Amino acid sequence: MTTSSYFLLVALGLLLYVCRSSFGSEHTCESDASPHPQGVCGSPLAEAVEAACELEESLQGGTGKKRGRASLLRKRRAFLSMLKARAKRNEASPLQRSGRGIVCECCKNHCNLEELTEYCPPVTEGSG
Protein backbone atom coordinates (compact mmCIF):
# COMPACT_ATOMS: atom_id res chain seq x y z
CA MET A 1 0.00 0.00 0.00
CA THR A 2 1.46 3.33 -1.01
CA THR A 3 1.70 6.32 1.29
CA SER A 4 -0.96 8.26 -0.62
CA SER A 5 -3.39 5.31 -0.45
CA TYR A 6 -2.76 4.98 3.27
CA PHE A 7 -3.30 8.73 3.77
CA LEU A 8 -6.54 8.58 1.76
CA LEU A 9 -7.77 5.64 3.84
CA VAL A 10 -7.00 7.46 7.12
CA ALA A 11 -8.66 10.65 5.85
CA LEU A 12 -11.77 8.69 4.84
CA GLY A 13 -11.88 7.04 8.27
CA LEU A 14 -11.62 10.41 10.01
CA LEU A 15 -14.34 11.85 7.79
CA LEU A 16 -16.68 8.98 8.64
CA TYR A 17 -15.92 9.41 12.34
CA VAL A 18 -16.64 13.16 12.21
CA CYS A 19 -19.88 12.64 10.28
CA ARG A 20 -21.05 9.99 12.71
CA SER A 21 -20.19 12.04 15.80
CA SER A 22 -21.80 15.20 14.41
CA PHE A 23 -25.11 13.37 14.20
CA GLY A 24 -24.80 12.47 17.88
CA SER A 25 -28.26 13.77 18.77
CA GLU A 26 -29.63 10.31 17.99
CA HIS A 27 -29.87 8.31 21.17
CA THR A 28 -29.07 4.63 21.37
CA CYS A 29 -30.16 2.32 24.15
CA GLU A 30 -29.11 -0.93 25.66
CA SER A 31 -31.89 -3.35 26.57
CA ASP A 32 -31.05 -3.11 30.29
CA ALA A 33 -30.81 0.71 30.40
CA SER A 34 -32.89 2.32 33.12
CA PRO A 35 -35.14 5.32 32.41
CA HIS A 36 -33.54 8.76 32.49
CA PRO A 37 -34.49 10.83 35.59
CA GLN A 38 -36.08 13.42 33.27
CA GLY A 39 -37.33 10.86 30.75
CA VAL A 40 -41.03 10.46 29.99
CA CYS A 41 -42.37 6.90 29.77
CA GLY A 42 -45.64 5.07 29.12
CA SER A 43 -48.92 6.96 28.79
CA PRO A 44 -47.34 10.33 29.69
CA LEU A 45 -45.01 9.83 26.72
CA ALA A 46 -47.94 9.34 24.33
CA GLU A 47 -49.64 12.40 25.83
CA ALA A 48 -46.43 14.43 25.36
CA VAL A 49 -46.30 13.39 21.69
CA GLU A 50 -49.97 14.34 21.28
CA ALA A 51 -49.34 17.78 22.80
CA ALA A 52 -46.23 18.28 20.66
CA CYS A 53 -48.13 17.29 17.51
CA GLU A 54 -51.00 19.65 18.32
CA LEU A 55 -48.51 22.46 18.97
CA GLU A 56 -46.71 21.78 15.69
CA GLU A 57 -50.01 21.73 13.80
CA SER A 58 -51.15 25.01 15.35
CA LEU A 59 -47.80 26.65 14.52
CA GLN A 60 -48.15 25.50 10.92
CA GLY A 61 -51.65 26.94 10.69
CA GLY A 62 -53.64 23.71 10.99
CA THR A 63 -55.57 22.19 8.10
CA GLY A 64 -57.77 25.22 7.50
CA LYS A 65 -60.91 23.12 7.02
CA LYS A 66 -63.31 22.29 9.82
CA ARG A 67 -64.72 19.20 8.09
CA GLY A 68 -61.30 17.73 7.37
CA ARG A 69 -60.10 18.60 10.85
CA ALA A 70 -62.51 16.18 12.58
CA SER A 71 -61.30 13.32 10.41
CA LEU A 72 -57.69 14.37 10.95
CA LEU A 73 -58.19 14.42 14.73
CA ARG A 74 -59.76 10.93 14.63
CA LYS A 75 -56.78 9.62 12.66
CA ARG A 76 -54.33 11.30 15.01
CA ARG A 77 -56.13 9.94 18.11
CA ALA A 78 -56.14 6.43 16.61
CA PHE A 79 -52.41 6.74 15.97
CA LEU A 80 -51.78 7.98 19.51
CA SER A 81 -53.89 5.24 21.11
CA MET A 82 -51.81 2.72 19.14
CA LEU A 83 -48.69 4.49 20.42
CA LYS A 84 -49.97 4.25 24.03
CA ALA A 85 -50.66 0.53 23.62
CA ARG A 86 -47.20 -0.01 22.17
CA ALA A 87 -45.63 1.93 25.07
CA LYS A 88 -47.51 -0.23 27.59
CA ARG A 89 -46.31 -3.40 25.83
CA ASN A 90 -42.73 -2.11 25.88
CA GLU A 91 -42.95 -1.34 29.62
CA ALA A 92 -44.34 -4.79 30.38
CA SER A 93 -41.79 -6.67 28.29
CA PRO A 94 -38.60 -7.61 30.11
CA LEU A 95 -36.84 -8.22 26.78
CA GLN A 96 -37.06 -4.84 25.11
CA ARG A 97 -35.26 -4.40 21.84
CA SER A 98 -32.19 -2.22 21.90
CA GLY A 99 -31.67 0.56 19.39
CA ARG A 100 -33.49 3.76 18.60
CA GLY A 101 -37.12 4.68 18.94
CA ILE A 102 -39.41 6.88 20.95
CA VAL A 103 -38.91 4.85 24.15
CA CYS A 104 -35.15 5.02 23.72
CA GLU A 105 -35.10 8.72 22.86
CA CYS A 106 -37.62 10.01 25.39
CA CYS A 107 -37.83 7.46 28.23
CA LYS A 108 -34.36 5.94 28.48
CA ASN A 109 -32.93 9.36 27.52
CA HIS A 110 -34.29 12.90 27.78
CA CYS A 111 -35.74 14.25 24.53
CA ASN A 112 -36.73 17.74 23.45
CA LEU A 113 -39.75 19.10 21.59
CA GLU A 114 -38.11 18.66 18.20
CA GLU A 115 -37.46 14.97 18.89
CA LEU A 116 -41.06 14.50 20.06
CA THR A 117 -42.47 16.03 16.87
CA GLU A 118 -40.49 13.51 14.79
CA TYR A 119 -43.06 10.94 15.97
CA CYS A 120 -46.12 12.93 14.83
CA PRO A 121 -48.21 11.29 12.12
CA PRO A 122 -47.99 13.16 8.83
CA VAL A 123 -50.57 15.91 8.40
CA THR A 124 -51.92 16.40 4.89
CA GLU A 125 -54.25 19.09 3.57
CA GLY A 126 -56.42 16.50 1.82
CA SER A 127 -57.10 14.37 4.93
CA GLY A 128 -60.80 13.82 5.24
From Swiss-Prot:
Expressed by the venom gland. One of its GO terms (cellular component) is extracellular region. SMART domains: IlGF (SM00078). InterPro entries: Insulin-like, Insulin-like_sf, Insulin-rel_pep, Insulin_CS, Insulin_family. PROSITE patterns: INSULIN (PS00262). SUPFAM superfamilies: Insulin-like. Residues 1-24 form the signal peptide. It comes from the Eukaryota. Its main location: secreted. Keywords: Amidation, Carbohydrate metabolism, Cleavage on pair of basic residues, Disulfide bond, Gamma-carboxyglutamic acid, Glucose metabolism, Hormone, Secreted, Signal, Toxin. Belongs to the insulin family. Heterodimer of A and B chains; disulfide-linked. This is Con-Ins F2b.
